[in-house]
Curated annotation (Swiss-Prot):
GO biological process assignments: N-acetylglucosamine metabolic process; peptidoglycan turnover
Binding site for ATP: 4-11, 133-139
Keyword terms of this UniProt record: ATP-binding, Carbohydrate metabolism, Kinase, Metal-binding, Nucleotide-binding, Transferase, Zinc
Protein's recorded name: N-acetyl-D-glucosamine kinase
Record's keyword annotation contains Nucleotide-binding: yes
GO MF annotation list: ATP binding; N-acetylglucosamine kinase activity; zinc ion binding
The keyword Membrane belongs to this UniProt entry's keyword annotation: no
Gene3D superfamilies: 3.30.420.40
Source organism of this protein record: Salmonella typhi
One protein family per Pfam: ROK
InterPro entries attached to this UniProt entry: ATPase_NBD (IPR043129), N-acetyl-D-glucosamine_kinase (IPR023505), ROK (IPR000600)
Membrane-spanning parts: none
Gene name as annotated: nagK
């Protein structure tokens, strides 16, 4: 059995998957915020419960935000302070007496989608989360992590020149939480979608409200969505020219907006090299379970 943990600032979620990659059981507990020993206990108790329930010693994979293992073997995860700065992988491997594998949660999202029954035919899969700006790359069923675990942090690329041509050269470059100016996640995420609407129309609406107006045929919302899709295509043009994936899977809250997957493909070719083919574009299939799935499938990559 394959055990996949999706760990964040508020919850530790465990999903147990069988050899056919089907979810058999799941359980969630709150994430301890201050005590590292309590954090380790929470994970180990869930593993023990799964072992007893299924009568096996399952493999353990963990998806967590941040850098799973720094040069000195410790975790860097600002959203999980109880474990950040600690040798999480080594400690859990010792306590559980098995090979524990860690990866970035966005990489786990991409891995989950790449191992979907419909998508395993594609050698190079790119996952993009239109919410956090994160993403990941999976080649032949294995995540590409890079030495710093930042492969796929597409949201921290800066606005390209073509974006400024589209939006205007006086378009404000917003400061990102990472400290840089003009990171594309500040414009393409759900909050960015709402910020763009407020910037152009001086109205403060949330993304679902804007989408509802679009669905009702509102002209202003229609113009906003057209501009947003053009901006998304411009930014993806740069990324796809570098990565050239077979499949692009889009997740996050905005992925539920069908216009993104249905209308994006027709906009992409003008921003790619003439010989390039746009990838197949699909909405993420596995929703909230994606993090657990991808973490569990870290043991399918041998």
């Amino acid at each position: 059995m394959y055990y996949g943990f999706d760990i964040g600032g508020t919850k530790i979620a465990l999903g147990v998957f069988d050899s056919t990659r089907r979810l058999q059981w799941e359980k969630r507990v709150p994430t301890p915020h201050t005590s590292y020993s309590a954090f380790l206990d929470a994970v180990c108790e869930l593993v023990a419960e799964a072992d007893q329930r299924f009568g096996v010693k399952g493999s353990v994979g963990i998806g967590i935000p941040g850098m799973p293992e720094t040069e000195d073997g410790t975790l860097y995860a600002a959203n999980v302070p109880a474990a950040s700065g600690k040798p999480l992988r080594a400690d859990l491997s010792a306590r559980l007496d098995r090979d524990v594998r860690l990866d970035n949660d966005a990489n786990c999202f991409a891995l989950s989608e790449a191992w979907d029954d419909e998508f395993t035919q594609y050698p190079l899969v790119m996952g993009l989360i239109l919410g956090t700006g994160g993403g990941g790359l999976v080649l032949n069923g294995k995540p590409i992590t890079g030495q710093s675990y930042i492969t796929g942090e597409f949201g921290h690329m800066r606005l390209p020149v073509d974006a400024l041509t589209l939006m205007g050269f006086d378009f404000p470059l917003r400061r990102c939480g990472c400290g840089q100016m003009g990171c594309i996640e500040n414009y393409l995420s759900g909050r960015g979608f709402a910020w763009l609407y407020q910037h152009y129309y001086d109205q403060s609406l949330q993304a679902p409200e804007i989408i509802a107006l679009w669905e009702q045929g509102d002209e202003q919302a229609h113009a906003h969505v057209e501009r947003y899709l053009d901006l998304l295509a411009v930014c993806l043009g740069n990324i796809l020219t570098i990565v050239d994936p077979d499949l692009l899977v889009i997740g996050g809250g905005l992925s539920n907006f069908t216009a993104i997957t249905t209308q994006l493909a027709e906009r992409l070719p003008r921003h790619l090299l003439p010989v390039a083919r746009a990838p197949r574009i699909e909405r993420a299939r596995h929703g909230d379970a994606g993090g657990m799935r991808g973490a569990a499938f870290l043991h399918l990559t041998d």
